[in-house]
Amino acid sequence: MKVQGSKWKVFCTFAPMKEAKIINDPVFGFIKIPRGLLYGIVEHPLFQRLNRINQLGLASVVYPGARHTRFQHSLGAFHLMSEAIVSLQQKGIFIFDAEAEAVQAAILMHDIGHGPFSHVLENTLIHGISHEDISLLMMEEINSCFNGQLNLAISVFKGDYPKNFLHQLISSQLDMDRLDYLRRDSFYTGVTEGNIGSARIIKMLNVVNDTLVVDQKGIYSLENYLTTRRLMYWQVYLHRTCVAYEKVLVNMLTRAKDLIKAGQDVFASPSLHYFLSNDVDAQWFSKHPEALRNYEELDDSDIWSAMKVWKHHEDKILSTLATDMLDRRIFKVEVHEDPIPEERIEGLHIKIAQQLDIPVEDAHYLMNVSTISKDMYNVEDDSIAILDKNGEITDISEASELLNVQLLSKKIRKYYLCYQRFE
C-alpha cells in the first residue's frame, strides 16, 4: 500500500538510535523504548490513535478503573517481548538483532487495527474483516512511510518467517499479548485473582525445533495462568452487565445505520458517517482506499460525541438508546443455560412496543438475544508444549497433575437475553 500523499510525511523520518526513551508504566514500572525505528512507531499518528481507544471497551460500567487504553497495553506487550528476547538469548537461543527489533515492532503494532471500543463494534461498523487484517493494512502503510524497514516485522507478524517461535511470541497460547492484558486488566479492574506470574512464565520459555516450549519448572505458573484466564473471561470480559451495555451500543449504531439508509439525517463525524452509510467488509476495503483512511480517523470519541447529539434526535428509538448509553440505563439481562423460547422473545417485542409506543417490528432495537460460548484451552488449536528434564516434549494436558484440562477444554455456552427496562 502506498503512502497516502504526504499525509504521514513528517512522521516518516526519525532520529538515529541514541539513548532509550523511558516511559513510566503503572504495571511494569519503567519501559525502555530504543530511539530509532521502534520509537518512530510509537510516535506515529496511527499508534498514537490507540490512546483514544479503551482496552476493555465498556467494562468501566462495572469496573470504574478499567479505563486503560490499547496504547498502554501495546507498550506493556512490547516490554514483555523485550524481556522474553533477553531470556531466550541467555539460554543460547540465537536471535539476530534485526529479528529482535522486528518482533518488538510487530508486537507494538499487533493491535493497531482496533476500532472504537476495541472488539465491541467489529461486526457493527464493519463485518467480514478482523482487526488483525486491518492491523496488517496499517502496518503496510507505516512500512511504506518507513521505506520498507518493517518488512521483517510484517513477515513475523503474518507467520511467514522461518523461525516460527518468533510468531508464537506474538500470537499463541503464551504470547506477550495475553501475558500483558491479563496482568493489566487485573490491575485496572481490581480483580486481583487475575494477576498472573508473567515474569516467571517468560523466564521458563525455551525453544525446541523453532517451536516455543516451557520448561517443566514453569508448569505450576502455567496452571495458574490458564485458570486465571478462565476467571477473567467470565468475571470481566463476559460479565453480564458489560455484555448488556455493549448490546445497547450495538443496537444504537444499528438504528443509526438504518435511519441513514432510510434517508434520515443523523449527525456523525465524517469518518463515523462513512461507516454508518456503507456496508463495509473486506472486499469494500480492497476496492475503496478511502475506507482505511476513514477507519484511521475513528476512535471512541466519535461514538461518544454522536451519542450526545442523538440523545435529542426526533427518532424515539435512537434517542432512547443514546440516553441509555449516556445515563447508564443498561438493558436488563438474563443468562440462561438453554436457548430463549420464541414465545418469550415475541412477548417482549409486544411489551417493548407498548411501553415506547413504537411499531412491534421495531422493538428488536430495544432488545438482544445472543449466544456466547468460550473454552480456555484447545489442544488441537494451539497447544502449550512442556519440555521435561529428559528433553521430551509433552502437552500440558498430559504433563500437569493438577490441571483439569477437560474442564478448561469444555466449551461453555450461555444464552443472553437483554432488553429495555420497563418503568
Where are these regions (language model features)?
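Short active-site segment of divalent metal-dependent hydrolases/proteases
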Residues: 109, 113-114
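Short alpha-helical catalytic segment bearing the HExxH-like zincin motif
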Residues: 103-108
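Histidine-centered, transition-metal-coordinating active-site segments
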Residues: 11-102, 116-122, 126-423
